[in-house]
């Protein structure tokens, strides 16, 4: 019409409800955005979560009370481009496609065991006389360690096999045998005496723990806070 578009009677009757609905949707999206601004969604592996991060979350919360840390614990690499994931911490070479990876630590590793098991290990060759716990998920190499420290390759290493790294740690703590572990992951249990490093012969591997972020993702306040906190906390552990 000359005066412009005229809504049909049915639409005119529904306008108040539609307006209220759109207003509610806008308010909900604004509320969601505000929540996202202070929630840091972090995906990690089980051993990193249970052996290192869980004992230090309180420190992060105290340093950054405005940030709520939400953990997604997964054995596989989560798609970091998802809107509900801000970043992750993963163990490997740091060459995953589609992400930027920053090494935070965990490159040195060596055998650990409970003190009673360590009493049976007077020399490297004694590893043939105790169970060697096998972690199917680990990238840490017994062969590389053997070569580095000069352990006879003919010595067979046998023991229980676990498909979960955290359970393998529990097995070592419960005196089931010797486990190859990253120094960063065994630091707390060594500090409190539940585990010891019987040979004190660490080696440096090509793998480590990386902070990973989807390529192209902006540097948010919460991500920057985590990065800075890790830079201080990891060397101290």
Predicted regions and their residues:
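A late-sequence structural motif
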Residues: 200-237
């Amino acid at each position: 019409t000359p005066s412009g578009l005229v809504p049909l009677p049915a639409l005119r009757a529904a306008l108040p409800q539609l307006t209220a609905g759109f207003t509610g949707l806008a308010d909900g999206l604004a509320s969601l955005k505000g929540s996202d601004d202070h929630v840091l969604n972090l995906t990690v592996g089980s051993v990193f979560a249970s052996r290192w991060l869980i004992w230090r979350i309180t420190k992060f919360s105290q340093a950054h009370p405005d940030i709520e840390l939400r953990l997604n614990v997964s054995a596989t690499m989560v798609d970091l481009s998802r809107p509900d994931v801000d970043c992750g911490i993963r163990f490997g070479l740091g060459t995953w496609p589609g992400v930027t990876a920053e090494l935070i630590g965990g490159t040195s590793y060596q055998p650990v065991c409970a003190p009673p098991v360590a009493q049976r290990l007077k020399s490297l060759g004694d590893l043939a006389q105790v169970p060697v716990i096998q972690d199917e998920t680990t990238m840490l190499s017994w062969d590389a360690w053997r070569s580095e420290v000069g352990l006879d390759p003919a010595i067979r290493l046998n023991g229980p096999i676990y498909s979960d790294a955290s359970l393998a740690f529990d097995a070592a703590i419960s005196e089931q045998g010797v486990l190859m572990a990253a120094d960063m992951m065994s630091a707390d249990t060594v500090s409190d005496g539940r585990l010891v490093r019987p040979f004190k012969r660490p080696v440096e591997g090509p793998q480590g723990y990386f902070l990973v972020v989807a390529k192209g993702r902006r540097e948010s306040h919460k991500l920057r806070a985590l990065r800075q906190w890790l830079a201080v906390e990891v060397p101290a552990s």
